[in-house]
Every structure is written in structure tokens, then in C-alpha cells.
């Protein structure tokens, strides 16, 4: 993607303080977008934006609880009052390990609240702004768990299946409005969440278990956040102007090459 492809575009990234979201923030800024880093962790969001600015990019940050309608409304109104919202990346999300038998109602509702309700609220707020301007681009982070049976991921799979379905519905409803909506469905990505999970559950065996996780991917390793970010940059650019209503698997062969 040409380095000036996103010049002057305003991008809002939820969950932008860590993992895939943070990598997407950095990649968009490197391609000349002005990035708003949103995260429930205010200090981490500020640091993510500061890193971008120190590297010569343009970034601002705001604390945002994506599951709280008042928080989302206030944040998006604040951003819109300063200009446009050309790009929305819904990367905020939480994970949960468990089968239907071991998932509590509280955990189920917590996953729904953040992953589904949060994506809905942010899309709704961004689209209201995009309809008043020349359009925009929305990218939701779904997962291979939305379309493939993943063990011990019942509530997470439910939530990402909903994200995928919302993506297609929004893309359909926004045809003719110059608003494109797609989702990216990664397989395993080596993020701080993975490291934290291994440290908590396999102390002293982190390297061994990381290698085991890598073996579950047909390509032989987990994805890097920066690789997902590269796809996101392309989807935000005019080079992808023909692409909407797509669920793009970023899976190292998981869907078609396992077994």
C-alpha cells in the first residue's frame, strides 16, 4: 500500500492499547492516518498514542468502555466534533475458555456485552457520523472461531459469530452509502493475552506450550499482530474499494488445510 494512501484519514481503533489493536494503530499511523486510540485502559491508550507520536505519526487517545452506551456516545461525539471519522476498527474484545457445560451465565453475558454489544455500539456511533460525510470504512475483528469448531471456546465462538453476522448485515444495509464493512477472522495470533495465559496456566513451561500452540497452525506458527495490521491497512485503503461484506480468513491454513 502506498505510504500516502491513508493521508488525512481519521481512524478510530477500539482496543488500541494492546495486541492486534495496538499494531493496527501503528500501521495506520505509518500510512499517514490520524489515529484515535480507544481503550478501557486510559494509561495504556495514552502510551500507545505517545509511541505513535514519538515515531512521527499522528495519534490521540481517549478512554472508552465499548460496552457502555454513554461512554461510546461521548467518545464518538468528542471525536466527530473535531473532524471526520473515516475509519472504524473494532478490535476491543475479551476471551474466555470453556465449554457450554463449564460456561457460567455471567461469563456468557460478559463476553456478549464486550464483544457483541461493544461492536454494535461503536458501529452505530461511527455510521451516524459517516452518513453525514462522504462515507467510511469499518473493519471488525472476528475470528476463525466464528466459522470453525474450536474446543473450549463456546462463549467466545458465540460472540465472534455474532460479529461476523453483524458485519454482513451492516455491509448490506450500507450499500449505496459509500460505507464498506468487512471483518478479519484470524486464527491464533501471538499477543500479550497468549503470553499471559501461558504464564498463568503453564508456569515455567511457556516456551514449550508456545511451540505446541504453533504446531496447531498448518503453516507452523502463530500470526503476528503486525501481519493482521497489514491486512487492515489494505482494507482501509482505496485499493480495497471494491471489497465489502467480506469475512477474510487470516488463518495460516486452519480452515482449509488441517488434517
Question: What positions do the PLM features span?
Answer:
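Active-site loop-to-helix junction immediately N-terminal to the catalytic Tyr of the SDR YXXXK motif
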Residues: 103, 149-157, 169, 197
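Short C-terminal tail/terminal secondary-structure segment
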Residues: 2, 148, 233, 244-259
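Substrate-binding pocket helix/loop in short-chain dehydrogenase/reductase
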Residues: 99-100, 107-112, 213
Amino acid at each position: 500500500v502506498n505510504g500516502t494512501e491513508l493521508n488525512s484519514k481519521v481512524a478510530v481503533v477500539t482496543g488500541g492499547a494492546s495486541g492486534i489493536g495496538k499494531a493496527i494503530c501503528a500501521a495506520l499511523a505509518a500510512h499517514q492516518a490520524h489515529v484515535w486510540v480507544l481503550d478501557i485502559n486510559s494509561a495504556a491508550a495514552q502510551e500507545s498514542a505517545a509511541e505513535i507520536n514519538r515515531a512521527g505519526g499522528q495519534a490521540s487517545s481517549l478512554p472508552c468502555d465499548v460496552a457502555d452506551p454513554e461512554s461510546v456516545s461521548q467518545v464518538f461525539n468528542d471525536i466527530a466534533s473535531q473532524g471526520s471519522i473515516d475509519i472504524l476498527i473494532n478490535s476491543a474484545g475479551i476471551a474466555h475458555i470453556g465449554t457450554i457445560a463449564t460456561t457460567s451465565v455471567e461469563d456468557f453475558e460478559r463476553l456478549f456485552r464486550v464483544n457483541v454489544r461493544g461492536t454494535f455500539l461503536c458501529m452505530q456511533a461511527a455510521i451516524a457520523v459517516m452518513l453525514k460525510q462522504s462515507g467510511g470504512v469499518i473493519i471488525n475483528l472476528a475470528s476463525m472461531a466464528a466459522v470453525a469448531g474450536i474446543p473450549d471456546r463456546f462463549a467466545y465462538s458465540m460472540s465472534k459469530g455474532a460479529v461476523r453476522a453483524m458485519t454482513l448485515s451492516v455491509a448490506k444495509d450500507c450499500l449505496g452509502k459509500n460505507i464498506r464493512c468487512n471483518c478479519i477472522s484470524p486464527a491464533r495470533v501471538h499477543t500479550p493475552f497468549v503470553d499471559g495465559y501461558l504464564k498463568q496456566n503453564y508456569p515455567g513451561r511457556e516456551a514449550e506450550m508456545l511451540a505446541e500452540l504453533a504446531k496447531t497452525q498448518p503453516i507452523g506458527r502463530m500470526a503476528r499482530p503486525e501481519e493482521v495490521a497489514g491486512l487492515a491497512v489494505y482494507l482501509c485503503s482505496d485499493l480495497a474499494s471494491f471489497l465489502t461484506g467480506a469475512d477474510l480468513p487470516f488463518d495460516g491454513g486452519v480452515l482449509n488445510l488441517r488434517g
